[in-house]
């Protein structure tokens, strides 16, 4: 039980990709990983079960003691019991495309109906992976879709597209965006929620080191009011290297490293910082992603970015067609730094 509790702490702090589980299911999934019984997890998991199991584990942030007791009492038996669903596909004992699969190295993945592959990593692998290794997913093609400045009136459209393709994304939140009530939907559907800025006023945010941290904490507190915790993943407004933060950047990053925050820039931009058509945004994305075996894609979620939403299905399809897996950013993800 202590190991399960530790893993629950990891998942609840970081979140993860995929479709949510119930609290009971999430605890059972974590119990399976903690006890090493990943094979039992496969029995009775059809496409829907696989998609749910793939990443809803971050919902254990709200797990109750009774849920933990369920894991303790049921052990692997509950996770391996046949599904009670009337869908015959859930009775398969051998996983097919669309069901949860656990490779030998400890990664679990599912392939959605659209052909997108989403990843859930075991807690052991998370602990074995660190930004300090400076290794960028050898042998794998990984795509991290990220949205700055949201949520907005476009958020539900974005979520609908992500769900259609069976992929998840990371939101870097603008605290005064006016649509923070969308955050629970983002979080509960298995996406990552992170800090961007509260005001996005560059001169104010970067006036001093203290001013930056005041803005960050104000944003984190606003997020916590919606989803119950303040994230530790961050994206600098304007990126970590910009025209406004040269005097304070070094001290801010040093303090982040000391206090457990992790910042992310990007290596692919869809170009929606300017006014472009959806086709142009797709073209910019493909041009920047060409030759990259892992991509952290910068996009924006705001009321004015309708063309970004229009371009999103084609952008996702490009990465699917080129063999990319999709994941959300975590504290141990390779650091995309300028």
Where are these regions (language model features)?
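Catalytic domains of cell-wall/extracellular-matrix polysaccharide-remodeling enzymes
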Residues: 157, 200-298, 302-320, 324-325, ...
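Active-site beta->alpha N-cap acidic-glycine motif
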Residues: 105-230, 334-335
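Short, low-complexity, disordered segments immediately C-terminal to signal peptides
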Residues: 46-74
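N-terminal secretory signal peptides
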Residues: 1-22, 32-43, 49
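Extracellular mucin-like PTS domains
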Residues: 66, 70-73, 79-93
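Twin-arginine (Tat) signal peptide motif
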Residues: 18-27, 56-57, 65
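Short, compositionally biased "basic patch" segments
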Residues: 95-108, 122-130, 249-262
């Amino acid at each position: 039980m202590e190991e399960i509790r530790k893993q629950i702490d990891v998942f609840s702090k970081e979140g993860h990709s995929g479709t949510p589980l119930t609290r009971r299911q999430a605890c059972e999934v974590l119990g399976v990983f903690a006890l090493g019984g990943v094979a039992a997890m496969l029995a009775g998991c059809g496409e829907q079960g696989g998609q749910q199991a793939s990443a809803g584990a971050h919902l254990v942030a709200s797990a109750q003691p009774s849920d933990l007791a369920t894991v303790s009492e049921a052990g692997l038996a509950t996770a391996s019991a046949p599904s009670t669903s009337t869908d015959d596909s859930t009775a398969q004992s051998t996983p097919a495309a669309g069901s949860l699969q656990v490779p030998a190295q400890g990664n679990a993945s599912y392939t959605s109906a659209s052909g997108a592959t989403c990843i859930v990593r075991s807690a052991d692998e998370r602990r074995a992976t660190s930004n300090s290794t400076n290794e960028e997913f050898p042998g794998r093609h990984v795509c991290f879709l990220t949205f700055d400045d949201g949520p907005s009136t476009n958020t539900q459209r974005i979520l609908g597209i992500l769900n259609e393709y069976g992929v998840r994304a990371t939101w870097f939140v603008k605290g005064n965006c006016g649509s923070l009530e969308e955050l629970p939907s983002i979080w509960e559907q298995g996406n990552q929620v992170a800090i961007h800025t509260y005001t996005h006023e560059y001169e104010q945010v970067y006036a001093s080191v203290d001013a930056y941290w005041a803005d960050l904490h104000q944003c984190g507190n606003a997020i916590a009011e919606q989803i119950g915790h303040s994230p530790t993943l961050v994206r600098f407004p304007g990126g970590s290297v910009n025209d406004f933060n040269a005097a304070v950047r070094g001290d801010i990053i040093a303090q982040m490293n000391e206090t457990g925050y992790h910042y992310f820039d990007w290596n692919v931009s869809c170009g929606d910082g300017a006014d472009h058509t959806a086709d142009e945004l797709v073209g910019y994305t493909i041009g920047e992603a060409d030759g990259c075996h892992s991509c952290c894609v910068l996009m924006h979620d705001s009321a004015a970015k309708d063309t970004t939403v229009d371009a999103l299905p084609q952008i996702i399809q490009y990465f699917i067609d080129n063999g990319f897996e999709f994941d959300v950013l975590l504290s141990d993800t390779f650091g995309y730094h300028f």
